[in-house]
């Protein structure tokens, strides 16, 4: 999964 703090849709 995506790392913490990462937003694919900022």
From Swiss-Prot:
Its predominant location is secreted
Annotated Gene Ontology cellular components are: extracellular region
The cellular location(s) given in this protein's UniProt record come to: Secreted
Is Secreted given among the entry's keywords? Answer: yes
Q: Where is the signal peptide?
A: none
Top-level taxon of the source organism? Eukaryota
Q: Which residues carry this modification: Arginine amide?
A: 10
Identify the keywords attached in UniProt to this record, alphabetized: Amidation, G-protein coupled receptor impairing toxin, Secreted, Toxin
- Write one Gene Ontology MF term: toxin activity
What function does the entry list?
Causes constriction on isolated rat ileum preparations and relaxation on rat duodenum muscle preparations at amounts higher than bradykinin. Is a partial agonist bradykinin receptor B2 (BDKRB2). Has insecticidal properties. May be related to the predation of insects by the spider webs.
Q: Which family does it belong to?
A: Belongs to the bradykinin-related peptide family.
Further remark, if any?
Has been extracted from the spider web.
Q: By what name is this protein known? A: Nephilakinin-3
Annotated organism of origin = Trichonephila clavipes
